[in-house]
């Protein structure tokens, strides 16, 4: 299933993500220069999120160019975020013309891929199936991606070759 996800928006998936589901966020541009305006937060941050029916952010993937970091976290609805997990941003994107972030939903963790190369495994902290995705940016900043992302939902069983 394909969805259009605009900057500063949240989109309901056609159905909750099932076991071994894959979500691919695709852009048609990549700008890794830090945003010149840090806005009121003081943090250069653009993020995509996987959200359950209760509003919990199951997986937050933040791109902080000024800090040269990907930030991973979970945020229970109405509560504080947990401890951040980080990896370096530099060198992760291979193709600046068609960048992608892919999330493979395993039973106990999320496998995060940048341009289809695994960069991190994030252990699940919250329960529930992903039912929504969002694309956000801190106020007054410029995003590293296009203003509109393509979001594709796939299932491993459907993309794996089968012998007849």
UniProtKB/Swiss-Prot annotation:
InterPro entries the UniProt entry points to: ConA-like_dom_sf, Galectin_CRD
Induction per the UniProt record: Induced during fruiting body formation.
Residues in the signal sequence: none
GO molecular function annotation: carbohydrate binding
Record flagged with keyword Secreted: yes
Pfam family, one: Gal-bind_lectin
Keywords assigned by UniProt, alphabetized: Cell wall, Extracellular matrix, Fruiting body, Lectin, Secreted
Residue span(s) of domain Galectin: 9-154
GO cellular component: extracellular region
Main subcellular localisation: secreted
Compartments (UniProt record): Secreted, Extracellular space, Extracellular matrix; Secreted, Cell wall
Entry function: Binds lactose. May play a role in fruiting body formation.
Subunit relationships: Homotetramer. Oligomerization is required for carbohydrate binding.
Protein name listed in UniProt: Galectin-3
Organism of origin: Coprinopsis cinerea (strain Okayama-7 / 130 / ATCC MYA-4618 / FGSC 9003) (Inky cap fungus)
Top-level taxonomy: Eukaryota, Fungi, Dikarya, Basidiomycota, Agaricomycotina
């Amino acid at each position: 299933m394909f969805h259009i996800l605009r900057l500063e928006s949240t989109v309901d998936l056609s159905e909750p993500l099932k076991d071994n589901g894959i979500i691919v966020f695709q852009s048609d541009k990549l700008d890794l220069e830090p945003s010149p305006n840090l806005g009121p937060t003081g943090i250069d941050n653009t993020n995509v999120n996987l959200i359950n029916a209760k509003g919990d952010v199951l997986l937050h993937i933040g791109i902080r160019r000024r800090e040269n970091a990907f930030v991973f976290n979970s945020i229970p609805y109405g509560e504080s975020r947990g401890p951040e997990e980080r990896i370096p941003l530099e060198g992760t994107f291979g193709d600046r013309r068609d960048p992608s972030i892919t999330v493979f939903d395993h039973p106990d963790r999320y496998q995060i891929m940048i341009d289809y190369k695994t960069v991190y495994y994030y252990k699940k902290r919250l329960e529930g199936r992903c039912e929504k995705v969002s694309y956000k940016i801190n106020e007054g900043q410029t995003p590293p991606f296009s203003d509109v992302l393509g979001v594709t939902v796939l299932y491993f069983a459907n993309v794996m070759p089968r012998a007849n």
